[in-house]
Amino acid sequence: MSNIIKYKKKILNGDLLTKEEVEELLEEDITDLAATANEIRESLCGNKFDLCTIINGKSGRCQENCKYCAQSAHFDTDIIEYNILNSDRIMNSAISNYNKGVHRFSVVTSGRALNNNEVDTLCKTYLKLKETCSIRLCASHGLLKYEDLKRLKDSGVTRYHNNLETSRKFFTKICTTHKYDDKIETIKNAKKAGFEICSGGIIGLGETMEDRIDMAFTLRELSVESVPVNILNPIKGTPLENQEILSYEEIIKTLALFRFILPTVQIRLAGGRTIISDKGKKALESGVNGAISGDMLTTLGIETSEDIKMIKNLGFEV
């Protein structure tokens, strides 16, 4: 019996794989690995697909030095900078996306964390949205304190996003202005405040497959509900502008392994799909059951209507 079949049976019996068992899958055929990851997804998660969109609610001038990010003030990138968007702009975007068939909507803001006035402003917007539209609200506002997280929760936000980005070991190679434990503390505080958690990372930063596996196990320990997987789209002006883009095989292998490690979570194909050949179609058949649609924060994405058509053609329910 191959390791793929053996470990599929173990997972479907309700057990979790160890890191050593996952490492045994590294040399398996990628096509078989992806197909089996998809079978695990279908057995444990069904065919329901979770589709979300984001809006860049505050852009640029970030004091953090994440090497991949166009919004860092440490690097010379050609992006538009602005403070918190007004309520009407955010609400119009949320309602428009809801009418297109999107399930979730997230406001994402640059910077280490919002200040009190910014939290106040967005809480008012979230309350208005909750009263106006049935789209599920998510938020990504950095390393907030518990008290601010609780205010967001009380305003109608149901899921908080904070990416680990990579493994603990590799993190200091991409960011030195905050610590891995700052992220974990924020995630734990968000859970304490009553949020579901969306946390994943970026692949293609120069990390190894071992780093990706380590990150996935940390996410499993944190019991997150949604794991967005971004593919680095190198931005001119950042230290990673010349980083080699991952092969599609490496992307598919990573997604499939994540399903073996995280059998019941939403694995969400996120930024970077425009740089791969089929806009993520094969990736969506590798254990994935969620995606971010539309434009990303500082890069173009894929039109939502095009995404929904592709997702339905693959047999998912949107």
Swiss-Prot record:
Keyword S-adenosyl-L-methionine: yes
Pathway in which this enzyme or protein is active: Cofactor biosynthesis; biotin biosynthesis; biotin from 7,8-diaminononanoate: step 2/2
Binding positions for [2Fe-2S] cluster per the UniProt entry: S106, C138, C198, R268
Cofactor note: Binds 1 [4Fe-4S] cluster. The cluster is coordinated with 3 cysteines and an exchangeable S-adenosyl-L-methionine.
Cofactor: [4Fe-4S] cluster; [2Fe-2S] cluster
Gene3D superfamilies given in the database record: Aldolase class I (3.20.20.70)
UniProt name for this protein: Biotin synthase
A molecular-function term among this protein's GO annotations: biotin synthase activity
Residues that, per the record, bind [4Fe-4S] cluster: C62, C66, C69
Function: Catalyzes the conversion of dethiobiotin (DTB) to biotin by the insertion of a sulfur atom into dethiobiotin via a radical-based mechanism.
Keyword match Hydrolase: no
Keywords carried by this UniProt record: 2Fe-2S, 4Fe-4S, Biotin biosynthesis, Iron, Iron-sulfur, Metal-binding, S-adenosyl-L-methionine, Transferase
Every Radical SAM core domain range: 44-273
Biological process annotations from GO: biotin biosynthetic process
InterPro entries given in the database record: Aldolase_TIM, BATS_dom, Biotin_synth/BioAB, Biotin_synthase, Elp3/MiaA/NifB-like_rSAM, rSAM
Similarity comment: family membership: Belongs to the radical SAM superfamily. Biotin synthase family.
EC numbers: 2.8.1.6
Reactions this protein catalyses: (4R,5S)-dethiobiotin + (sulfur carrier)-SH + 2 reduced [2Fe-2S]-[ferredoxin] + 2 S-adenosyl-L-methionine = (sulfur carrier)-H + biotin + 2 5'-deoxyadenosine + 2 L-methionine + 2 oxidized [2Fe-2S]-[ferredoxin]
The species this protein was found in: Clostridium botulinum (strain Okra / Type B1)
PANTHER family in the cross-refs: BIOTIN SYNTHASE, BIOTIN SYNTHASE, MITOCHONDRIAL
UniProt-listed HAMAP family: BioB
